[in-house]
Amino acid sequence: MDFINSYEDANRAAAYSTLQFANTYFLAYRDLPAIIAHHVAGKRALDFGCGTGRSTRFLQALGFDVIGVDISEDMVRLARDTDPSGDYRLIPGDDFTGLGVGNFDLVLSAFTFDNVPGGLKGRIISDLGKLLTPKGAIISIVSSPEIYTHEWASFSTKDFPENASAKSGDVVRIIVTDHHDRRPVEDILCTDDTYQEIFANAGLNAIQTLRPLATRSESYTWSNETTVAPWVIYVLKRAS
């Protein structure tokens, strides 16, 4: 199956701009303030793959001076419309020229690598590592392989039984149910073993790996989130 970047689409961007920090998405962000406070000292941040600016505004609320970057013109336009005072930049592919080597205390990547195919992941992660200050950190939130084989408060995969036999690098499909655009999103499955190999080749260490689970005390109607982690959060630092 050929891969299509589902988010280079004006209608998809408009739907994506309505997403909040609710349901399954809540678990991706719930623990970030504590994770960031533990691993990040400075306040200069890059939101890589900022989309319509949801994660960028999240970092702003934590006191960061943030630049949001994305390859989608529609996404960046909507981010600027929502947050006119924010710094949102359209970048061509994986060209980080102008962002500054060693300039960022934090690089956040929320779900971006789900849509990055093949060997491009490794090159981008390596280049992002070069943007870090000596003690800086990359925090990368990615979909767990299990997200593509279960039902969730924010997603459905029941129409795609072929996901169950997918291997790392294969195209998988999922439907976001938290907005009105119910067209399937195509992602690239990537296992933990593959990510760990990519990190090592990029000269980065995964110093913490988290798989957040929901609790029954939270004010959402969970499907599988209390027993199966939909997300994996990697905290990466330069190898010494």
Could you tell me what each predicted segment is?
Residues 122-134:
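A short glycine-rich, Lys/Arg-flanked "PGG" loop and its adjoining helix->strand segment in the class I
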Residues 46, 52-96:
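Class I SAM-dependent methyltransferase SAM/SAH-binding core
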